[in-house]
Every structure is written in C-alpha cells, then in structure tokens.
Amino acid sequence: KRYLKDSLEYETIIKARHGQGFFKDEILKRMDRCIVTGSKEIVEACHIKPWVFSNDSEKIDGYNGILLTPNCHKLFDKGLISFDPNGHLIKSKKLDSKVFNKLIIEDKNIDKTSILNDKTLNYLKWHRKNFKSNF
C-alpha cells in the first residue's frame, strides 16, 4: 500500500484525476472507439503529447487525445506505433511484426477523420518527432 507524503500530493493527484475525466469527455466529443481496432468496450483516453511534457492547457485539450485499447495505448506511449499525417497507423521498426499482430489484433482501418484536424495533427507531429528514431 502506498501512502501519500502530504496533503499537497493528495490534492495534486485528485486534481489530475479530475482533469482526466474532463480530458476523456473532450475526446468523446470527437470519437467513440479505438481508432485502431474499432473497439468501443475497452478504450482509454490517451494523451498524444504526454502529460509530463504538456503545459496546463495541453493536459486537458481534447485534441491532444485519442481513444485506444490498453494494448494500443501502451504501444503508442512507448512510441512503438503512431499515425502519419493522413491518419494511417505506422509501426515502429523496433516492434517485431509477430508481436505487433498479436497485440493490435487487427488494424480495422477505422475512419480517422476525427484526428485529421490541425490541432490533433500537430500533436501527432510532436509524437512522431519525439519518437523519430523508432520509425
């Protein structure tokens, strides 16, 4: 069991979780499923530009987010998958194809118009640039 150091740490965690709900709600205004697998049942709100590198407004900006299944979310956070400027899924050269096929299940080629806007494309450009050695 983890104990919090002080009330400031507790308040920070509560505010972060509160912001996460708002963040996911903003993403849900643009999409309702994983943009890779099409799953609606098990999706997570994923920051494109990670929380740790985002300023306060970017942390809750729904355009800095996409819905992904847990497997896709983990791969995206590690820079093992991303999306090109046309919304197509791209796989890292560091990710074995057999592992990719098992984890992704299948790229259903979901309509990516929800990410094809200037704001989200800029965040995706940041993601590709910061993981450029992977692609």
Give the ranges of each region predicted by the language model.
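Ligand/cofactor pocket segment of small-molecule handling proteins
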Residues: 33
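A detector for short metal-coordination/catalytic motifs
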Residues: 18, 22, 29-30, 40-43, ...
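A short mid-domain helix/strand-loop element embedded in enzyme catalytic domains
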Residues: 1-25, 36-45
